[in-house]
Protein backbone atom coordinates (compact mmCIF):
# COMPACT_ATOMS: atom_id res chain seq x y z
CA UNK A 1 0.00 0.00 0.00
CA UNK A 2 2.84 2.41 0.81
CA UNK A 3 3.77 2.52 -2.90
CA UNK A 4 0.44 4.27 -3.57
CA UNK A 5 1.56 7.30 -1.55
CA UNK A 6 4.06 9.87 -2.74
CA UNK A 7 7.14 10.33 -0.53
CA UNK A 8 5.77 13.60 0.87
CA UNK A 9 2.42 11.97 1.68
CA UNK A 10 4.24 9.09 3.37
CA UNK A 11 6.17 11.63 5.45
CA UNK A 12 3.00 13.48 6.42
CA UNK A 13 1.21 10.26 7.28
CA UNK A 14 3.95 8.77 9.46
CA UNK A 15 4.51 11.94 11.50
CA UNK A 16 0.76 12.28 12.01
CA UNK A 17 0.39 8.64 13.01
CA UNK A 18 3.28 8.92 15.48
CA UNK A 19 1.90 12.13 16.99
CA UNK A 20 -1.52 10.54 17.39
CA UNK A 21 0.12 8.03 19.72
CA UNK A 22 0.90 10.88 22.14
CA UNK A 23 -2.81 11.38 22.78
CA UNK A 24 -4.41 9.60 25.75
CA UNK A 25 -8.04 9.10 26.74
CA UNK A 26 -9.45 12.00 28.73
CA UNK A 27 -7.30 14.60 26.99
CA UNK A 28 -8.54 17.87 25.56
CA UNK A 29 -6.67 18.23 22.29
CA UNK A 30 -6.22 21.19 19.98
CA UNK A 31 -6.63 20.08 16.37
CA UNK A 32 -4.63 22.01 13.79
CA UNK A 33 -5.46 23.03 10.24
CA UNK A 34 -3.79 22.08 6.97
CA UNK A 35 -2.91 18.99 4.97
CA UNK A 36 -0.64 17.40 7.60
CA UNK A 37 -3.06 18.21 10.42
CA UNK A 38 -5.82 16.55 8.40
CA UNK A 39 -3.84 13.31 8.45
CA UNK A 40 -3.57 13.70 12.23
CA UNK A 41 -7.33 14.10 12.63
CA UNK A 42 -7.91 10.99 10.51
CA UNK A 43 -5.39 9.02 12.59
CA UNK A 44 -7.09 10.10 15.81
CA UNK A 45 -10.45 9.15 14.36
CA UNK A 46 -9.09 5.69 13.61
CA UNK A 47 -7.99 5.34 17.25
CA UNK A 48 -11.42 6.48 18.43
CA UNK A 49 -13.09 3.80 16.32
CA UNK A 50 -10.62 0.96 16.79
CA UNK A 51 -9.33 1.51 20.32
CA UNK A 52 -12.16 3.36 22.03
CA UNK A 53 -9.98 6.44 22.55
CA UNK A 54 -12.03 9.08 24.35
CA UNK A 55 -10.90 12.64 23.71
CA UNK A 56 -12.38 16.06 23.23
CA UNK A 57 -11.07 18.10 20.32
CA UNK A 58 -10.88 21.86 19.90
CA UNK A 59 -10.60 22.57 16.16
CA UNK A 60 -8.72 25.58 14.82
CA UNK A 61 -10.93 26.04 11.74
CA UNK A 62 -14.30 25.14 10.33
CA UNK A 63 -12.56 22.74 7.93
CA UNK A 64 -10.96 20.86 10.81
CA UNK A 65 -14.22 20.85 12.76
CA UNK A 66 -16.04 19.25 9.83
CA UNK A 67 -13.36 16.58 9.43
CA UNK A 68 -13.29 15.83 13.17
CA UNK A 69 -17.04 15.28 13.22
CA UNK A 70 -16.76 13.08 10.14
CA UNK A 71 -14.24 10.74 11.79
CA UNK A 72 -16.06 10.58 15.13
CA UNK A 73 -14.12 12.98 17.35
CA UNK A 74 -16.18 14.93 19.88
CA UNK A 75 -15.49 18.65 19.59
CA UNK A 76 -16.11 21.66 21.81
CA UNK A 77 -15.15 25.32 21.77
CA UNK A 78 -11.98 26.64 23.36
CA UNK A 79 -14.03 28.62 25.87
CA UNK A 80 -15.77 25.43 26.96
CA UNK A 81 -12.47 23.55 27.22
CA UNK A 82 -10.66 26.44 28.96
CA UNK A 83 -7.27 24.72 29.03
CA UNK A 84 -5.92 22.06 26.66
CA UNK A 85 -3.59 19.20 27.46
CA UNK A 86 -2.06 19.15 24.01
CA UNK A 87 -2.26 20.80 20.61
CA UNK A 88 -1.01 19.05 17.49
CA UNK A 89 -0.63 21.14 14.35
CA UNK A 90 1.44 21.41 11.20
CA UNK A 91 3.90 24.12 10.20
CA UNK A 92 4.96 25.75 6.97
CA UNK A 93 8.53 26.16 8.26
CA UNK A 94 10.41 25.54 11.49
CA UNK A 95 13.99 26.31 12.52
CA UNK A 96 16.42 24.78 15.00
CA UNK A 97 14.92 26.75 17.89
CA UNK A 98 11.43 25.47 17.01
CA UNK A 99 10.30 28.89 15.85
CA UNK A 100 7.58 28.46 13.24
CA UNK A 101 5.91 30.07 10.27
CA UNK A 102 2.26 29.02 10.17
CA UNK A 103 -0.86 30.21 8.43
CA UNK A 104 -0.52 28.84 4.93
CA UNK A 105 -4.00 27.42 5.41
CA UNK A 106 -5.37 30.75 6.58
CA UNK A 107 -6.12 29.77 10.19
CA UNK A 108 -3.14 31.36 11.97
CA UNK A 109 -5.19 33.40 14.45
CA UNK A 110 -7.18 30.46 15.78
CA UNK A 111 -4.09 28.25 15.65
CA UNK A 112 -2.06 30.65 17.79
CA UNK A 113 -4.82 31.16 20.36
CA UNK A 114 -5.36 27.41 20.69
CA UNK A 115 -1.63 26.68 20.91
CA UNK A 116 -1.16 29.35 23.59
CA UNK A 117 -3.97 27.73 25.60
CA UNK A 118 -2.24 24.34 25.64
CA UNK A 119 0.12 22.75 28.12
CA UNK A 120 2.12 21.35 25.21
CA UNK A 121 2.32 22.08 21.49
CA UNK A 122 3.46 19.36 19.11
CA UNK A 123 4.26 20.24 15.51
CA UNK A 124 3.99 17.57 12.83
CA UNK A 125 5.87 18.14 9.59
CA UNK A 126 7.60 16.45 6.71
CA UNK A 127 11.36 16.87 6.57
CA UNK A 128 11.08 19.52 3.85
CA UNK A 129 9.67 22.01 6.36
CA UNK A 130 12.91 22.20 8.36
CA UNK A 131 15.01 25.29 7.56
CA UNK A 132 18.11 26.99 8.92
CA UNK A 133 16.49 30.43 8.79
CA UNK A 134 12.80 31.27 8.53
CA UNK A 135 11.46 33.28 5.63
CA UNK A 136 11.50 31.28 2.40
CA UNK A 137 7.82 30.50 2.95
CA UNK A 138 5.66 33.65 2.79
CA UNK A 139 4.78 34.97 6.23
CA UNK A 140 1.01 35.51 6.56
CA UNK A 141 -0.51 38.25 8.67
CA UNK A 142 -4.23 38.51 9.44
CA UNK A 143 -5.71 41.99 9.01
CA UNK A 144 -9.18 43.46 9.50
CA UNK A 145 -11.21 44.44 6.40
CA UNK A 146 -11.60 48.08 7.50
CA UNK A 147 -8.86 50.23 5.98
CA UNK A 148 -7.31 47.22 4.27
CA UNK A 149 -5.24 49.22 1.80
CA UNK A 150 -4.06 51.57 4.54
CA UNK A 151 -3.00 48.67 6.74
CA UNK A 152 -1.22 47.06 3.79
CA UNK A 153 0.71 50.28 3.17
CA UNK A 154 1.64 50.58 6.85
CA UNK A 155 2.93 47.01 6.85
CA UNK A 156 5.07 47.73 3.79
CA UNK A 157 6.49 50.82 5.50
CA UNK A 158 7.27 48.78 8.61
CA UNK A 159 9.22 46.19 6.63
CA UNK A 160 11.71 48.84 5.49
CA UNK A 161 13.32 48.91 8.95
CA UNK A 162 13.17 45.14 9.54
CA UNK A 163 16.02 42.63 9.19
CA UNK A 164 14.60 40.78 6.18
CA UNK A 165 15.97 39.99 2.73
CA UNK A 166 12.80 40.68 0.71
CA UNK A 167 9.99 43.16 1.25
CA UNK A 168 7.30 42.21 -1.26
CA UNK A 169 3.76 41.61 -0.03
CA UNK A 170 0.50 40.46 -1.56
CA UNK A 171 -3.14 40.23 -0.54
CA UNK A 172 -4.18 36.58 -0.49
CA UNK A 173 -6.96 35.90 -2.96
CA UNK A 174 -9.68 33.27 -3.22
CA UNK A 175 -10.45 33.32 -6.91
CA UNK A 176 -11.21 36.92 -7.81
CA UNK A 177 -11.99 37.97 -4.23
CA UNK A 178 -9.81 38.47 -1.14
CA UNK A 179 -9.47 35.35 1.00
CA UNK A 180 -11.65 35.54 4.13
CA UNK A 181 -10.65 33.86 7.40
CA UNK A 182 -13.04 32.22 9.85
CA UNK A 183 -13.06 35.53 11.75
CA UNK A 184 -14.02 37.49 8.63
CA UNK A 185 -10.56 39.00 8.19
CA UNK A 186 -8.09 38.98 5.30
CA UNK A 187 -4.54 37.68 4.87
CA UNK A 188 -1.51 39.59 3.59
CA UNK A 189 1.42 37.35 2.65
CA UNK A 190 4.90 38.80 3.21
CA UNK A 191 7.57 37.49 0.83
CA UNK A 192 10.62 38.09 3.00
CA UNK A 193 13.01 35.35 1.74
CA UNK A 194 14.99 35.47 5.01
CA UNK A 195 13.99 36.69 8.47
CA UNK A 196 16.96 37.83 10.53
CA UNK A 197 15.17 38.49 13.84
CA UNK A 198 11.87 36.62 13.99
CA UNK A 199 11.06 37.72 17.53
CA UNK A 200 11.45 41.43 16.78
CA UNK A 201 9.51 41.11 13.53
CA UNK A 202 6.61 39.38 15.28
CA UNK A 203 6.40 42.09 17.95
CA UNK A 204 6.66 44.92 15.44
CA UNK A 205 4.06 43.60 13.01
CA UNK A 206 1.49 43.22 15.78
CA UNK A 207 1.89 46.91 16.61
CA UNK A 208 0.70 47.98 13.14
CA UNK A 209 -2.89 49.27 13.33
CA UNK A 210 -5.21 46.86 11.54
CA UNK A 211 -2.98 43.82 12.02
CA UNK A 212 -4.69 41.21 14.18
CA UNK A 213 -1.94 38.58 14.34
CA UNK A 214 1.05 37.26 12.42
CA UNK A 215 2.14 33.75 11.50
CA UNK A 216 5.37 33.69 13.51
CA UNK A 217 5.07 31.26 16.43
CA UNK A 218 7.89 32.04 18.87
CA UNK A 219 8.54 30.02 22.06
CA UNK A 220 5.30 28.08 21.63
CA UNK A 221 6.34 24.73 20.15
CA UNK A 222 7.67 22.07 22.56
CA UNK A 223 8.03 19.03 20.30
CA UNK A 224 8.48 18.40 16.59
CA UNK A 225 7.50 15.07 15.07
CA UNK A 226 9.32 14.93 11.75
CA UNK A 227 8.35 12.52 8.99
CA UNK A 228 10.50 11.16 6.17
CA UNK A 229 9.45 9.65 2.87
CA UNK A 230 10.89 6.23 3.76
CA UNK A 231 8.69 5.89 6.86
CA UNK A 232 11.28 7.14 9.36
CA UNK A 233 10.06 9.42 12.14
CA UNK A 234 12.06 11.65 14.49
CA UNK A 235 10.56 13.00 17.70
CA UNK A 236 12.50 16.06 18.85
CA UNK A 237 11.83 17.63 22.23
CA UNK A 238 13.24 21.10 22.84
CA UNK A 239 12.74 20.98 26.62
CA UNK A 240 14.94 17.95 27.31
CA UNK A 241 17.00 18.13 24.11
CA UNK A 242 16.24 14.57 23.04
CA UNK A 243 15.82 13.11 19.55
CA UNK A 244 14.18 9.69 19.20
CA UNK A 245 13.99 7.88 15.85
CA UNK A 246 11.84 4.99 14.72
CA UNK A 247 10.32 3.59 11.55
CA UNK A 248 6.56 3.41 11.16
CA UNK A 249 5.01 0.36 9.52
CA UNK A 250 2.47 0.80 6.73
CA UNK A 251 -0.55 -1.50 6.88
CA UNK A 252 -3.08 -2.31 4.18
CA UNK A 253 -5.75 -0.45 6.15
CA UNK A 254 -3.75 2.77 5.91
CA UNK A 255 -5.27 3.39 2.47
CA UNK A 256 -8.25 5.00 4.20
CA UNK A 257 -6.06 8.11 4.38
CA UNK A 258 -5.22 8.20 0.67
CA UNK A 259 -8.10 10.55 -0.19
CA UNK A 260 -6.44 13.47 1.60
CA UNK A 261 -4.85 16.10 -0.62
CA UNK A 262 -2.69 19.17 -0.07
Curated annotation (Swiss-Prot):
Enzyme class: isomerase
Highest taxon of the lineage: Bacteria
A single GO molecular function term of this UniProt record: ribose-5-phosphate isomerase activity
E.C. designation(s): 5.3.1.6
Pathway field: Carbohydrate degradation; pentose phosphate pathway; D-ribose 5-phosphate from D-ribulose 5-phosphate (non-oxidative stage): step 1/1
Residue numbers annotated as active site: 111
GO cellular component, as recorded: cytosol
SS bond list: none
The keyword Isomerase appears for this protein: yes
Residues spanning the signal sequence: none
Catalytic reaction annotation: aldehydo-D-ribose 5-phosphate = D-ribulose 5-phosphate
Residues that bind substrate: 33-36, 89-92, 102-105, 129
Record keywords, A-Z: Isomerase
SUPFAM superfamilies, per the entry: D-ribose-5-phosphate isomerase (RpiA), lid domain, NagB/RpiA/CoA transferase-like
GO terms for biological process, alphabetical: D-ribose metabolic process; pentose-phosphate shunt, non-oxidative branch
NCBIfam families, per database record: PRK00702.1, rpiA
Assembly mode: Homodimer.
Reported function: Catalyzes the reversible conversion of ribose-5-phosphate to ribulose 5-phosphate.
Family: Belongs to the ribose 5-phosphate isomerase family.
Protein name from the UniProt record: Ribose-5-phosphate isomerase A
Species for this entry: Roseobacter denitrificans (strain ATCC 33942 / OCh 114)
Source lineage: Bacteria, Pseudomonadati, Pseudomonadota, Alphaproteobacteria, Rhodobacterales
Gene: rpiA
Amino acid sequence: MSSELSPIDKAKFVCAKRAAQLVESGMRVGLGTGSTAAWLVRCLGQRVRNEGLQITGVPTSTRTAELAREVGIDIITLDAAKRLDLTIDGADEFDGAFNLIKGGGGALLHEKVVAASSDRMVVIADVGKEVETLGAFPLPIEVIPFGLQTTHALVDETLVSMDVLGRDSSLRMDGDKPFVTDEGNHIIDLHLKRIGDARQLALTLNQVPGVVENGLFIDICDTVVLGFGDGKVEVRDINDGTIASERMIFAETDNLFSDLSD
